[in-house]
Design a protein with these regions (language model features):
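Segments of small-molecule ligand-sensing domains
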Residues: 310-322, 333-390
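Short, low-complexity disordered leader/linker segments with a strong preference
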Residues: 1-39, 397-399
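Hydrophobic alpha-helical segments within soluble ligand-binding/sensing domains
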Residues: 93, 157-181, 222-224, 247, ...
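Extracellular/periplasmic periplasmic-binding protein-like sensory domains
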Residues: 139, 152, 251-326, 338, ...
Length: 399
């Protein structure tokens, strides 16, 4: 097949896909909208193994909601945000979602937490015609569109996707370090499997043989067996498909064994708490990230004001998780405002798919969606812990 013919076939396939998605009948809901308010909901881990993420995300969402409402709301309507605690338990997330949709009558589900918890409840959200916006998981199921499933058009994500971000970060590290035996330790769930996919795909693309692949159960606290195995196998680069405490735990075990090896974390490791709690143990850790992590003593302008105000409101240091929660509400408000005074589910969907860009004050890549693309961006950074702080090494990376 000639290149010209091949490109024509590809273009035709894209057009067919776009037409199928655009013309499929999508059920949308108008529940939760009154003359005075818009009801939105979320489920977070406020009491479970990743509550360090959940509490901060919830705080960021509350802060943005208060600011939007103080400025007059969205075309005169105030946001009413309802937050439920899933404890990072898929069964509880399902119950929370049913309550939010059936009892509270939420218009949108925004910023829901975690791959296994979001996955367990996603069909409930979409089947009800409720938009699922900007969940705290970058797994493919949160943005990948299936033309045979019209309700897929109700899901959007604005985080760097796990597979693509892992591939970009691995490409950077392989070119930087030239490892002979790159290995991976990952959480045994949708998140970890996406990171594993990115790891395997990028090594295959670069013709590098993968080393040990070892997993752990969600909620685990002992990683001695995994670390000992990778050390014995001669791994010279370790990708961590972990969150916060697992990252610190894995690197602590490596230090106990006197094992000096380069660690690269997937995007959920790129948070302030890792160097704050891990201290010297995590010094030198690399990670894929979406935004430069701001620090109060070096931040400027609106970002510095935001950091100061967050600390006043919640009595705790701001972090990346809070920024993500804040931006989830701000992004929703941007597109809901664009949808106009006569807000409906269909008009919100049209606004989201319009191609208009939302720009975060925190410097994340612009969020932009279309009828055939419900992922805001795939560009990432690679950062490293240096002297107890995350430092950007390279930005605008893609594989």
């Amino acid at each position: 097949m000639s290149l010209r013919v091949g490109m024509a076939v590809l273009a035709g396939a894209v057009l067919v896909f776009g037409a199928a998605m655009a013309h499929a009948q999508v059920k949308t809901t108008n529940q939760g909208i009154t003359d005075t308010e818009i009801v939105i909901g979320t489920h977070q881990d406020l009491s479970g193994p990743i509550k360090t993420w959940g509490v901060s995300v919830a705080n960021g969402m509350k802060m943005a909601t208060e600011e939007v409402n103080a400025a007059g709301g969205i075309n005169g309507r105030k946001i009413r945000l309802i937050i439920e605690d899933s404890g990072y338990d898929p069964k509880r997330a399902v119950l929370d979602t049913q309550k939010l949709i059936e009892k509270d009558q939420v218009f949108s589900m925004i910023g829901a937490m975690g791959s296994p918890t979001v996955l367990a409840a996603q069909d409930i959200v979409l089947d009800a015609g409720v938009t699922q916006l900007f969940p705290l998981t970058a797994a493919q199921f949160t943005f990948k569109l299936d033309p045979a499933k019209p309700q897929d058009r109700l899901k959007f994500n604005n985080l760097p996707p796990y597979i693509e971000s892992t591939r970009a970060a691995m490409k950077y590290m392989v070119e930087l370090k030239h490892p002979k035996k790159p290995c991976i330790m990952f959480q045994d769930d949708e998140y970890g499997k996406n990171v594993l996919d990115g790891f395997m795909q990028q090594l295959a693309a670069m013709k590098v043989e993968p080393g040990t692949q070892t997993s752990y159960k969600r909620g685990a606290t002992d990683f001695s067996a995994q670390i000992a195995r990778m050390k014995a196998d001669g791994c010279d680069l370790v990708l961590l498909g972990t969150v916060i405490r697992e990252t610190i735990g894995a690197m602590t075990e490596a230090k106990k064994l006197g094992w000096t090896v380069d660690f690269l974390g997937a995007t959920p490791t790129n948070v302030i708490e890792v160097p704050l709690l891990g201290k010297d143990v995590v010094e030198g850790l690399y990670a894929a990230g979406g935004i430069e992590i701001p620090y109060e003593d070096t931040a400027k302008g609106k970002v510095k004001d935001w950091l100061v105000n967050y600390k006043k409101l919640f009595g705790t240091e701001p972090n990346t998780q809070a920024i993500i929660g804040y931006d989830a509400i701000e992004t929703f408000a941007f597109y809901a405002d664009m949808a106009g005074k006569d807000l409906t589910g269909a008009k919100l969907l049209a606004a989201l798919e319009s191609g208009k860009e939302y720009h975060s004050m925190f410097g994340a890549p612009p969020a932009k969606f279309s009828p055939t693309n419900h992922l805001a961006s795939t560009a990432i950074q690679v950062q490293q812990v240096q002297n107890g702080r995350w430092k950007v090494l390279q930005e605008g990376l893609e594989y």
